[in-house]
């Protein structure tokens, strides 16, 4: 779980977080899940020639976050296969659910071709789920 401060630049004219900015917060949550392990994204690319890209996203905006709020992004890897990672993510303020999202990520190589996770990477990802 990581905490994020909402800055003025994140908000719309009403002082609420602009809807597209929640996607940035979700991305940070998924990245931080990787960073808490033994790799980062650049190391994954160098070692495995792999990049993770979003294939689909389902997001429910339940309540707004506002300028200067401190929000938390909770991320869990719910389903892992050789060609797909399914994340459940929540954005919370003071134990109140603001956003609930399901994000499906797929592995591609530097040419943009979908690839399968090898055994080492699959086992590693199983440890963070």
Positions of predicted regions on the chain:
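Short, positively charged
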Residues: 43, 49-50, 68-70, 86-88
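Active-site beta-strand->loop segment that positions catalytic residues and contacts the acyl thioester
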Residues: 55-70, 76-82
């Amino acid at each position: 779980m990581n905490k994020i401060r909402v800055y003025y630049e994140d908000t719309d004219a009403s002082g609420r977080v602009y809807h597209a900015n929640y996607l940035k917060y979700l991305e940070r949550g998924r990245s931080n899940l990787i960073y808490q392990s033994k790799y980062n994204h650049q190391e994954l690319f160098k070692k495995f020639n792999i990049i993770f890209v979003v294939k689909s996203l389902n997001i429910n905006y339940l309540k707004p976050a506002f300028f200067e709020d401190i929000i938390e992004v909770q991320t869990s890897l719910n389903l892992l296969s050789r060609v797909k990672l399914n994340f459940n993510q929540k954005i919370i303020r003071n134990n109140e659910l603001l956003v609930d999202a399901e994000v499906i990520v797929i592995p591609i190589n530097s040419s943009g071709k979908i690839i399968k996770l090898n055994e080492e990477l699959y086992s590693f990802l199983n440890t963070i789920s």
